[in-house]
Amino acid sequence: MSHYEGDLRPAGARFVIVCSRWNARITDALVAGACHSLVDNGVPDDAVDVVRVPGAWEIPIVANLLAQAGQHAAIIALGCVVRGDTRHYEHVADLCAEGMMSVQMQTGVPVLNGVLAVECIKDAEMRAGGSHGNKGAETALAALEMVSLLEKLP
């Protein structure tokens, strides 16, 4: 029986972080965490690109263009959507996730979902370097592992 599992060795891969500017204090911390994770695991600074988009809604179209361009082994999507008084939050968070899933299924390029969908800004703070860690860093580690795994699969 064969067993396949990715590791955290980048093997010369390029990565791109697509991050929303909305809730910048949170998203800046997510980007910093992702960059540190990549560099700490051997990815050179010049093998990481960062693309800023206005909000989470715009992440899938940019991820799609980048995936089709074929210059990156994985796309790390980061953002922060906070529940408000209307259902807008649900539409943005759900359709952003669906869009990212569609991109990776259609292109074969992993799109890792680090878009926070939280009840309040305090929840986001806890996930952007607070008591719940840094989800940007965790998403970058998942990207490293997926790139490695996809290279190993028959």
Swiss-Prot record:
One Pfam family per UniProt: DMRL_synthase
UniProt catalytic activity: (2S)-2-hydroxy-3-oxobutyl phosphate + 5-amino-6-(D-ribitylamino)uracil = 6,7-dimethyl-8-(1-D-ribityl)lumazine + phosphate + 2 H2O + H(+)
- Is Transferase among this UniProt entry's keywords? yes
Q: Is the keyword DNA damage in the record? A: no
What's a GO cellular component annotated to this UniProt protein? Answer: riboflavin synthase complex
Q: Under which EC number(s) is this enzyme classified? A: 2.5.1.78
UniProt keyword terms in alphabetical order:
Riboflavin biosynthesis, Transferase
Superkingdom classification of source: Bacteria
The residues responsible for catalysis, as annotated, are 88
List the InterPro entries hit by this protein, alphabetically: LS (IPR034964), LS/RS (IPR002180), LS/RS_sf (IPR036467)
Residues annotated for (2S)-2-hydroxy-3-oxobutyl phosphate binding in this entry: 85-86, 127
**Part of which pathway?**
Cofactor biosynthesis; riboflavin biosynthesis; riboflavin from 2-hydroxy-3-oxobutyl phosphate and 5-amino-6-(D-ribitylamino)uracil: step 1/2
* Gene Ontology process terms (BP): riboflavin biosynthetic process
Q: What does this protein do?
A: Catalyzes the formation of 6,7-dimethyl-8-ribityllumazine by condensation of 5-amino-6-(D-ribitylamino)uracil with 3,4-dihydroxy-2-butanone 4-phosphate. This is the penultimate step in the biosynthesis of riboflavin.
Family of the protein in this entry: Belongs to the DMRL synthase family.
Oligomeric state and interaction partners are given as: Forms an icosahedral capsid composed of 60 subunits, arranged as a dodecamer of pentamers.
Protein name, UniProt field: 6,7-dimethyl-8-ribityllumazine synthase
**The organism of origin for this protein:** Xylella fastidiosa (strain Temecula1 / ATCC 700964)
